[in-house]
Amino acid sequence: MPAIITNKFRMNNAEQFEESFSEATPTVYYLGIGRAQEFGTLTRPDARTEFEGTELLPTTPGDSVMNEFKNYDDLLAAKKITGSNVSFVVPRRNWVTGTTYDIYRHDYEEFITGSTSTRQTANSGATTLFDSTFYVMTGARNVYKCLDNNNNSASTDEPTGTSTTVITTSDSYKWKYMYTLSASDQANFLSTDFMGVTTDSTVSAAAVDGSLDIVKIKTAGSSYTVSGGATSGTITAVPIRGDGTGGVASVTLTSGAITAVTITTRGSGYTFGYIRNADILAATNAGGAGSGAELDVIIPPKGGHGFNAVEELGGFFVMLNTTLEGTEATNSGDFTAANDFRKITLIKNPNNAAGSAASAATLRATYAVKIASSPTPGTFTPDEEINQSGTGAVGRVVEWDSTNNILYYIQTRHNDAGADANGNVTAFSGANVITGQTSSATGTPDTSTQTVNSVVFTSGYSAPELQHDSGEILYVENRTKISRATDQTENIKLVIEF
C-alpha cells in the first residue's frame, strides 16, 4: 500500500537532535579527528588486505560493525560540541538578478483536475516545495519567501526591508520577509551550501493563521464582463469560500479574460479556499457573464507566513560548528599540530579513560609514553612504525614531543601499525627500549608515575583520555588530508540531514 514518511517526521527528528545538545540532561557529543596515516591498501596479519582508497580519493566510509571499531583505532583527539555550536540550517540560495524564482505553494505534488490534469509542479520543474527555489538570501543577509513571481518572470529588483507585510518590488515580485542572519550566525552557520535559519519573533507575532495573500490564475476563462457590459475592468468584493472567514478578492478583466486577482481582505483561518465562478458573476459590479476561469487560492503554512521559519523553509538540516585552535592549548593541548588528519567523526556519549561519562572540553585519543632523558633519546618522526623489545609491541608515531620527551602513538589492527609478529595488538609496557623503524631513534620509557604537560602517566604510560570503543559514532567523513599548525584554526561545519 502507498505510504510516505512526511517532512513533519523529518522535522521532528531534527528538532529532537538539536534539543539534545541543550536540554536539562543533555546528550554529550564530541567532534573527533583521526587518521594521521595515509589512505591506501592495508595489510592484515592474515596476509589479506583492506582497500581504503587513495590519498586523493579515499573510499566512502563503510557502515559496518567492523568500521565501527576501526574508527577508534586511529582517532587522534575530540572536542566537545555545546548547544551554542548547533543550529538548524537550510540550503543556501543567494538572490541573483535575472533569476526566475519559484513561488511558495501549498499544493506542490498534488493532483488536481481541471482544464489540465497533472500534478502541480514549480516553474523550475521541482515537484516538492522544499526542492523549489521559493526563498532567497540577499546581500544584506535578509531572507525572504517568494509569494509571487509576476507570472514566472525574472527577478531584477533585490528585496529589501523587514516589514511584516508583503513586500512588492519594482519587478512586481511579492516577497515575505522571514528573518535576518545575525553576525554570529553568519560567522558560525553560513557556508557555501547552507545557511542558518531562525524564527524572527516580530515576524512570528505578526503572522495570522490561515490569512490569504495570493491567488494564482490557472485558467483565465473568457467572456467575463463588468457591470455595463465592458469586457475590461475590475470586479470587486468577490468572496473567498472555504473553512476560513473574511477573505475577499477583486478580479481584473482584460478583453473578457481574468488577468489578475488581488486579495483585498486577507481573512483568517483558511486551510482551504476557493473562488467560485458563481461568486464572480454575482459580485455587485459584475456584468453577470463569463465562464471557464480556474483560480487557485494559495494557503499559507500553519500559523501563517513567518510564524515558524525553521519549518516553513525546510529546516530538517542541523549544522554543528566546531573550531579547532592549534593544539587547543587552553584545553590541555590535546590536539596535535605535528601531524595531519583525514577523518572527521561525531561521537555520542563517549567515556573518559576511567570509564565514566566524558565531560572535558577536549580529549586526547592517542596513547602516550614518557621517555627517560637518560640515555638521551633519538628523534622519532611522525607516521613511522615503532617496535618495543621484549613485549614485541608495534605502533605508529603520531607526535614526538622532544621538549617533554613524550611519544604519542596509535595502535591499529594492521601490520606495521599495531599488529605484532603473532598477529596480536600487544600493549607497550615496562622499561623495554622503543625503536623507530624509519628514524632508528631509540628511547627508554620512564616508568615513574607523574603528570607532564597535562598528561597523566602511570608507570610511564598514559591511556587515551577518550576510551576507545565507548559511546556511539554517528557520523564519519573520509577526506583528503588537513595539515595542522600551532597558529592555525580549522572551522569544521558538519551538516546532518534528517
Model-derived segments and spans:
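Tryptophan-rich substrate-binding surfaces of secreted polymer-degrading and adhesive proteins
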Residues: 1-209, 294-296, 304, 351-362, ...
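Conserved, function-critical positions that sit in or immediately flank catalytic
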Residues: 169-498
